[in-house]
Amino acid sequence: MLAMQAQPLPKDPTIRTGKLKNGMTYYIRHNAKEAGLADFYIAQRVGSILEEPRQRGLAHFLEHMAFNGTKNFPGKGKRLGIVPWCETIGVKFGANLNAYTSIDQTVYHIGSAPLKRESIIDSCLLVLHDWSHYLLLEDQEIDKERGVIHEEWRTRRAGMAVQRLQEQAMPKVYKGTKYEDCLPIGSMDIVDNFAYQDLRDYYHKWYRPDLQAIIVVGDIDVDKMEKKIKKTFSSIPMPKGAAERIYYTVDDNEKMIIDIEKDKEQPIALCHIYQKREATPDSEKNTEKYLRDGYIDALISAMLNDRLAELRQLPVPPFQSATSRASQFFLSRTKDAFSLSISCKQDNILGGIVSAVAAAERARQHGFTQTELDRAKKLRLNAAERRANMQSDYRNSHYVNVCVDNFLEGEPLLSVDYKLEIAKKLDREVTLADVNAAVKELITDKNQVVVMYAPDKEGFEIPTEKQLEQIILAAQQQDYAPYEEAELAESLISSMPKAGTIVSEQPWRHGFTELTLSNGMKVYTKKTDYEADAVSLRMQADGGTSQYGDEDIPNFALISSGITEAGIGTFDAVTLRKMLTGKSVRVSPSVGSKGQSISGSASLKDMEVMFQLAYLYFTQPRKDTAAFASLMSRQRAFLANRNASPKVDYNDSIRAILYGHHPRMEPVVQQTLDKVSYDRILEIYKERFSDAANFKTVIIGNFDEQELRRLLCQYLAPLPATNKHEQTNYSRIPQIVGGEKLVKFSKPQATPLANVSIFLTADVPFTPQSDLELDFLRRCLSIAYTDSVREEKGGTYGVSVAFDLDKDDHPNTTLKISYNADPNRYEELNPIVYQQLKNIAENGPAASSMQKVKEYLIKQYAQVAITNDYWSYIIWHELDDDVDFDRDYCQMVEQMTPAAVQRMARQLLDAKRCIEVTMLSE
């Protein structure tokens, strides 16, 4: 048995792999799902852990420089740079062209490249070739990028206390190791001042073939691609006397390591308890034993998380939330750990930690039950079966990730079918005794590290390190009674409703069929094979909270959660979750300002369960005062320190200013909860779902049409109908105020930051043409901002541009421009942001930008038009707005003119409805 488990696993035969003489690895896979497209990646076993002290932050800096001049894509008027060249073929910077740097790896990619010409394939490979060894790293470009990196640091740290706290914790968690100070963003003092040669030294030392892999997946000829890879990359030299790539280890510790870090912008206390253990070496991962060990670890985590979720549902829950997992320790891949993560309540920090530790200790002492194991195994097997059923739908990115994980992490390179075979074998062979023996090894009281991130706030009592150590060790030494649970029912519905009928049926647009049920509900169905094992459901009706006066505002925010937290029918939320374990189904009700809806999705075999849940959410919402008390307790704990982050005050201010302090846009605070009525919530919910005839229902997927008709008659046609056909009361829907306004204020911020949001509104024709003009405008603006504010000025990590077009809003169009920057540069940068919009309004967008956007949108259409989500988007616009956003889309894109985009920009400016809300640092 042990010998068999140690045998190498069979490699996925659909993925071709090889190694060039210079040591470079390659992976190639044909995938026809995305016709005419391919992904090109270069993965590197190189990250910030390899930096020398004077190079802190340069691994990440180098990643940025890979887009700022290479041998064959120098830019600056010589030849196109990588970014502008990629955008000429519809590969958008950020969305399709990007990279990331972590502690141990760096990965670059060109995604969804259109293979319209052989030269595009050659050029994409040439980009990877240059990334490997031929970056220019020119002085001037390095200096320009310093500001961009600094603003990325500012953006990531501001409003993200956890990142700052993590940085503070690392020297204690990793004392005496390379991991003490190794986060990729690095030191801003070094980023701002390093010598050019330091960056070049890092590049030439670590970017080399033996640490690199080329990955190409898509609609390609594998044989031809292999020849191209060999031709393009074989000449890249492997340096002589190359430095050893060391994977730094983490020592064990006898005494518990405890670190408590505080931050004024941290809203809640988070406690992470790690129990360290040895990680499986990459060389030992390609074995059945590795899969078996991982399978058992996943079972244990799933079962323990179910128990922790039960504690969260108590009328007075001990914590906000708690989860367990078996994974890598903190940030180091050379050490694994079992971990507990507890989100604590301010008034019960120690009690919450003890409750989570006790749940883990109970599992260690007594193990799990056969019923729990059966559910957890069912969950794993169902997931494996679903992956096998869906493998024809996998996008290129799925196979790329498999290859990246194999090269960088040593994960087995297995076919989906073999994974299913192994899952079935493990399901049969792994016993309760196996799992309960493993849990005694996984969960321990040795080799522990405890990290707490807490608010730095007067009156917020934080335990001492000594207290944490004492209560955790004490909880681990106690004896606990075995876990018990009630027996589950066999089915969700004890008494089936009397079936209704389909009274009419007719073809509808875009391949949909319109069915009218006996209760008056209209159902629109479209059978697709875009996803082999998926069906989606959305039921929607007008009305929502607009049907109720302002006295009910406190209840609105808790309607959806108040219903789902109670479970459904005769089952509480915990029991319902257990009953649905192993089923691929999700159904959730929602009551919004304009309407109410039920959304769902399922695998084909669980489609009936999806309809049963929808039926129950209509007819049998459950009252559970204990569950609601639990929800309210957690909400109060969450809101206790809500305003710790300045971002919260900023977003509150935006809503208040935009909507003229409308009461329906006020945030939920502690005082709001004081006015909430559970009985009123239930009453509103029942009223919203009392008239099935007012609902339109859309079902899309690879369903059996006769089976779908049976389910419609059995579960949707019997739904009650009052035939009131309520409409949305738009007099109660908040609208953005008119006029021009600049609101600028300052608040203390841990990381000095200018937060800028600009909103321009106007009324434009609600047409596909207007929608497309707005899309072109925002994309052309984004290109202009990248060139001017980011690249030329080094003033921000990025400027975000978004728009909204809603038929029933007045004004119906909003263009939002937002960015973060150094507060000291606000006066310099903000005029540039406005000027770029004025430039388009006065002169039109650049012809090159228009062409880039056209290439991207046409390519994107081919990708999204083979998804169920796209057709859901199309039909709901037709049903709600009587507008076809699909008709002649590509033709409209091709025919879009700079003059049309210019006209839209001018219309937004001429409306003179511009509101800017800016928060600076005190």
Regions found by a protein language model. Give the residues of each.
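M16 family metallopeptidases and their MPP-like homologs
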Residues: R29, E34-E51, L58-A59, G77-D130, ...
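Active-site-flanking alpha-helical
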Residues: E63-F67, T564
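Hydrophobic, small-residue-rich alpha-helical packing segments that form membrane-like cores
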Residues: E141, R146-P209, I215-V217, V222-K230, ...
